[in-house]
Amino acid sequence: RTAKYEKKEAIRLEKYEKKEAAYRKKHPDSPSAPVKKKKRKFQTLEDYLPIEKIANGIVYTTDHRYVKILEIEPINFLLRSAREQQSIIYSFISYLKISPVKLQIKMISKKADINRHLEQSAKELERESDPRCRELQRDYIQFVRHLSSREAVSRRFFLIFEYEPFNVNRKTEEKEILAALETAAQTAKTFLYQCGNDVVMHENEDEFTTDVLYTLLNRTLCTDKPLPERITEVLGQRMAEGKDVDTIHCNAFTAPESLDLKHSNYVRINGLYHTYLMVPSDGYKNKVTPGWLSLLINAGEGIDIDFYLHKQPKDKIQQRLGQQIRINRSKIKDASDTNSDFDDLDSAIRSGYFLKAGLANNEDFYYMNLLITITASDLEELQWRIQEMKKLLISQDMDLRSCYFLQEQGFRSSLPLASLDKKLYELSKRNVLTTGAAS
């Protein structure tokens, strides 16, 4: 056995030496020892989030952008008369003409927390002396409890934009950036007030911004553990570990406890299932009515909407539009009117002239993207909600597709940082004029 083993070992060493000699002959400059692969760097959830710090009511991102988040009080647009709706749209058009180039409008929905309201109603009931009024108040409390058990949903709306430098080559100081963002926020407040919307003012803007991120990343945790409790808990853990509390990163308070990105069609955050869907470029209707997004906004609990608008340079678009119309007109001459290509080309030419007329009528050209986030406590409920959402959009002649193998990009794009992933942007961008965007 020993002789046989030694013979095998000798053959193995001989083969190894031949391979080594052949490798040296082919790569004379390379070292003989094989290069070790670099170990993958361990990344915590705090490091993963693209946020450097939150200060002065602004989010400083890791890619050196400055983002402002405004909370907007909504109005019930569908209950307004046709004349009022038209007036609101024109007021919003006025804002879009002077708004930042990139805008993100975010809507988050979750089950309404009515405990505070019920506590206040109970206190008023105790103070009431009239027995008939007490009876009415008891009925009201019972009605609110019954209603909240089935369909009570609270919605919050946010307008997000970033600082846009006037001159890219010039270095801008931080105080100039803060002043520019504050001016943009005041402009938004003035014009949205004309639409009937109020911008919610907060005593501590940093705390508000941190709370928004904490609520988004910790859907279930934020109801049981508000942000002040979370901050106290994290600080206590750091002190117990003997770490410096003064240098703690803001992501330590907002980061979720667990984040699972291993699946192709969903993301798990703190055990809650999130899936991201998009309306593809060809999934929109050609004509829209005022308030056409209300259907998605009122879809129910666990449905979040991210609406992106990216204004394009007018002169470049007009040049490209004229060029494309000329190309399509030359193509249609060679196509027969019985071919399916003829209808597509005819539609493209008509759309081109429509956009050309709109631009000549002082409208702006935008690329619009629509990202939908669906959350559920288990996979079965998640699949049911996805199917129901797709049916809802099909009923309105719209299409909806899951972001397969792009869930991580969907997660990062859904953060209130006015940053849509490039691949998702290309897959879902749709051209729209100011009137369509404002509707």
Feature annotation, model-predicted:
Residues 1-438:
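Extended, folded cores of ATP/NTP-driven motor/assembly subunits in large transport
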